[in-house]
Amino acid sequence: MIKVKIVRVNKKAHLPVYATAHAAGMDVAACLDEPVMLEPFSTALIPSGFAIELPEGYEAQLRPRSGLALKHLISLPNSPATIDADYRGEVRVILVNFGKEPFSVAHGDRIAQMVVSRVERVDFDEAEELSMTQRGEGGFGHTGISAVHPRTH
């Protein structure tokens, strides 16, 4: 387990917590003075009230919460959102309402999850061509939609 420095930039902030013993992501709560109404097909930048100092070689990703997505069509349009190790500002979450009804976000509502992971930096080696594979340039649905067996009609 790594240690990550965290600072409350708002004394009312709820710090991120793991909801269960084996959760990969920590719940991130809204830190608001008053509720924010998220109208259908609109976005809002929601403060968390905290800032973090990640060690070099790590990132944090903000991801949607499955319950908000399933029940209210609330998500993060830039998911996963990346927090770099050298960022020192308040963690804020962009929420989008894909639903048909307004959605109210209140102080303390768990609005996202945060996963901290190692990242590798790369040094690109420019070449004239790439090696051949069976897949080649296939992408964007080229394998079809059937999970196990080809469909029979």
From Swiss-Prot:
One of its GO terms (biological process) is dUMP biosynthetic process. Transmembrane segments: none annotated. It comes from the Bacteria. The keyword Hydrolase applies. InterPro entries: dUTPase, dUTPase-like, dUTPase-like_sf, dUTPase_trimeric. Pathway: Pyrimidine metabolism; dUMP biosynthesis; dUMP from dCTP (dUTP route): step 2/2. It is an enzyme of class 3 (hydrolase). Residues 132-153 are annotated as: Disordered. Keywords: Hydrolase, Magnesium, Metal-binding, Nucleotide metabolism. Its cofactor is Mg(2+). Its EC number is 3.6.1.23. The keyword Phosphoprotein does not apply. It catalyses: dUTP + H2O = dUMP + diphosphate + H(+). CDD domains: trimeric_dUTPase (cd07557). Substrate binds at R65, S66, G67, N78, T82, I83, D84. One of its GO terms (molecular function) is magnesium ion binding. Belongs to the dUTPase family. PANTHER family: DEOXYURIDINE 5'-TRIPHOSPHATE NUCLEOTIDOHYDROLASE (PTHR11241:SF0). This enzyme is involved in nucleotide metabolism: it produces dUMP, the immediate precursor of thymidine nucleotides and it decreases the intracellular concentration of dUTP so that uracil cannot be incorporated into DNA. NCBIfam families: dut, PRK00601.1. This is Deoxyuridine 5'-triphosphate nucleotidohydrolase. It comes from Chlorobium limicola (strain DSM 245 / NBRC 103803 / 6330). The gene is dut.
